[in-house]
Amino acid sequence: MKQYLITGGTGMVGSQLVNEIKKSDSHITILTRHDQISNNKKISYVNWAKSGWEHKVPQNIDVVINLAGATLNKRWTPEYKQTLMLSRIQSTQALYELFKSRNKAPKVLFNASATGYYPPDLFMSYTEVYKTLPFDFLSDIVYQWERFAQQFEQLGTRVVIGRFGIILSNEGGALQTMKLPYEYYIGGKLGSGQQWYSWIHINDLIQAILFLINNESASGPFNLTAPIPERQNLFGYTLARAMHKPHETWVPSLAMRLILGQMSTVVLDTQKVLPNKIQALGFQFKYSNLKMALEDLISK
């Protein structure tokens, strides 16, 4: 039986990942910030907001999946920016300290990250070979998160970092926010409309994470985005067609920045990111083009 330890296991990605893992011969320990009782013998919860939580984590953990982090979908006040950073750094460091104090380290750590690692560019195509230093607040979060995760290599753990693109899911996240203006017939181009949206269907993301965990030759950063990113204007048009709604309005960049503040960088300052490394290992995307992905999600 394989032993999993998961942070962020009750979130959008984590909950679907748990549902997939429990189909196998496994036991899953989920770290949460509040008390929960499991009605499934394959799942147990540990409240790591309480002192002594470390002693409740099984000794023989094989796989650690670190998804913990405050949502980006809130206005980035100075206080919340600190929350965004610390929620990721402190959880990752706590995991490292836990296993550093033990004789047995996990075989593999899968640590979430984001395509915000790469600088915004309308013409550059980014693959995993591109290296950079932080250039804005979001990239600093990503850079520090990955740096803290890489400490696990000192324990002999294989470290896999998944740089998530825009996750398309019916269970929350970006797609629900994107659909809202179209439901009120006011969807359209945002800013220039030329910025890239590097997206991924939630089902492909879950399968990609498990693929990387189970592939012993996988290590380092992986771009977890569909093979065909789209520019925002075409993305919006494709979404409108799937919803049978118009795509006619335009919100200037200045208005977006005034409305959203620094959070507007997630919408306006984006990157064209390609999943070369995971494809080279043989992973195949079920939803490789946007039309197919949106039609699957909108029809449900």
Swiss-Prot record:
InterPro entries: DUF1731 (IPR013549), Epimerase_deHydtase (IPR001509), NAD(P)-bd_dom_sf (IPR036291), SDR39U1 (IPR010099). SUPFAM superfamilies: NAD(P)-binding Rossmann-fold domains. Pfam families: DUF1731, Epimerase. PANTHER family: EPIMERASE FAMILY PROTEIN SDR39U1 (PTHR11092:SF0), SUGAR NUCLEOTIDE EPIMERASE RELATED (PTHR11092). Belongs to the NAD(P)-dependent epimerase/dehydratase family. SDR39U1 subfamily. This is Epimerase family protein SAR0825. It comes from Staphylococcus aureus (strain MRSA252). The lineage of its organism: Bacteria, Bacillati, Bacillota, Bacilli, Bacillales.
